[in-house]
Amino acid sequence: MGSFNDFLDAEFRPPRNWSLNAPLKFKSETLTREERELLVECGVQVTKTTSTITVPKGYITDLASVPRVCWAFIAPFDCARAAVVHDIMYEKINGAFKKGIIESKAERETYRKIADDMFLEGMQSAEPSVPVWKQQAAYRAVRAFGRWAINSSAPRKGI
């Protein structure tokens, strides 16, 4: 399992966003050298030696994009830190696709799988722990529905 540098320090920005007051770092234990290189290529801040992904201070996120009707089962706060790391990865992957760094939709799917796997590892590393059934439900949801977010042409707020 990976590890986060700290708890999430963010300020609410109505109507649905949060702004990070401090950088959020996630050190992955499963990211391969090839995956690190792919992420660096598309603009994700990840160290080449320790596989630490950094989300900078000031980053704007919606935490987890969970429909309110599902909050009784998976509230956005259950997987918030993992979701923030996932958000920035999707944003950078989308940007790299638009700039031609990622050349095909099939290649973008490879990057999306890496981001989704980091989301799962982040939930597995969370303190307090996220129950396994919630991890699996959230992971399956991003695998099933994340393609719409990553294929979106709408700009994210980011930094």
Name each region found by the language model.
Residues 1-159:
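Extended terminal accessory/targeting regions
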